[in-house]
Amino acid sequence: MRPLSLKGHERALTRVRFNREGDLTFSCAKDKKPCVWYTENGERIGSYDGHNGAVWDIDVSWDTSKCVTASGDLTVKIWDAELGSCIYTINHQTPMKSCGFSYSGNLVCYTTQKMTKNLSTVQVRDLRDGNQMAEGAESFFSTQFDVNATTALFSQMDDIITIGFESGLLQQYDLRNPDSPINTNEVVHRYSIQDLQLSPRGDFLISASRDKTAALLDVNDLKKLKQYKSERPVNSACIAPNRDHICLGGGEDAMQVTQTAVSAGHFEAKIYHMVFEEEFARFKGHFGPINTMAWHPSGSIIATGGEDGYVRIQEFDEDYLGFTYDF
């Protein structure tokens, strides 16, 4: 492993993502400046300035023309990815927790937190419709929940949205018939779902939870196919684009880190075989729990972001690339 350690954030990382080609890495943290980097050499290209609170999530459109950020300053912002200028700002009464583009890049979804009299909501807006993007405008899809929605993403083209909740519940809504969820899974996780990621081919979802497990799910019906067990809460999980492997990241909760030996904290990223559910490799690097991770489209790089404020770009060596699993 030849890691690049990128220092551009003052506080804990909340999300790292690659664009579709993998030449750019996008990151955001609990400081107020999302950053974009060259994946090849770790050089920082710049930051997106405009938020006034922790940035919880970032996503980039398929053509890398736009990116979207969700922040604790009660706004979601749509940016010109190349110029760094803010195109739209969406305001709400409570903090925004997650956001994402649809397959086409024309729709954006985001989740808001439950606070005082305001329920948690998931909303979708169409960037092509100027009326929806105007200040104070209504979104074309909005649904409310009594429990916090922690993460949401488009799981099938521009039609179906998958939502993960603080209670461990998973639900899917079809935007063409949005009155009630089309699929629900209440038993896959016992505690909060920290992360949901789609496989590169779009046929699987992987969920990471505080109940110390990650689950591989069928994207069509949310049926649990495989489960991967860890010794500590799992904050993020991702699927390899060209191998039957998945990677988990997490570790001892950040609040308890000072009472934990580094070896006992399980701050390593762990690689499992997707089918056999067996861990066969792990790599160290972060001093503290891993909060977010993403697998590069080439399959030869993993980016991780930790509570220590660093983004680490880990490039696999021949031991991994030439590895074949013994049946």
From Swiss-Prot:
An example Gene Ontology molecular-function term: RNA binding
Keyword Repeat: yes
Top-level taxon of the source organism: Eukaryota
WD repeat residues: 8-49, 51-89, 188-227, 229-268, 285-324
GO BP terms: cytoplasmic translational initiation; formation of cytoplasmic translation initiation complex
SUPFAM superfamilies registered for this protein in UniProt: WD40 repeat-like
Subunit structure: Component of the eukaryotic translation initiation factor 3 (eIF-3) complex.
Described purpose of this protein according to its UniProt entry: Component of the eukaryotic translation initiation factor 3 (eIF-3) complex, which is involved in protein synthesis of a specialized repertoire of mRNAs and, together with other initiation factors, stimulates binding of mRNA and methionyl-tRNAi to the 40S ribosome. The eIF-3 complex specifically targets and initiates translation of a subset of mRNAs involved in cell proliferation.
Protein family (similarity comment): Belongs to the eIF-3 subunit I family.
HAMAP family xref list: eIF3i (MF_03008)
The protein, known as: Eukaryotic translation initiation factor 3 subunit I
Species whose genome carries this gene: Caenorhabditis briggsae
